[in-house]
Amino acid sequence: WATIDECEETCNVTFKTCCGPPGDWQCVEACPV
């Protein structure tokens, strides 16, 4: 997703979280450390 807001809108319903460089947010189980 382009923005974390867009990502969270989609990911929060699946109980996942958003990680990634700005402009390329991904929906993941957990952020890599």
Swiss-Prot record:
Keywords: Bromination, Disulfide bond, Gamma-carboxyglutamic acid, Hydroxylation, Knottin, Neurotoxin, Secreted, Toxin
Expression tissues: Expressed by the venom duct.
The keyword Isomerase belongs to this UniProt entry's keyword annotation: no
GO terms assigned for molecular function: toxin activity
Keyword Disulfide bond: yes
Protein localization: Secreted
Domain of life of the source: Eukaryota
Disulfide bonds: C7-C19, C11-C27, C18-C31
Modified residues (6'-bromotryptophan): W1
Entry-annotated residues carrying 4-hydroxyproline: P21, P22
4-carboxyglutamate: modified positions: E6, E8, E9, E29
Main location: secreted
GO cellular component assignments: extracellular region
Domain topic, free-text comment: The presence of a 'disulfide through disulfide knot' structurally defines this protein as a knottin. The cysteine framework is VI/VII (C-C-CC-C-C).
Function according to Swiss-Prot or TrEMBL: Induces sleep-like symptoms in mice of all ages.
Name of the protein in question: Bromosleeper peptide
Organism the protein comes from: Conus radiatus (Rayed cone)
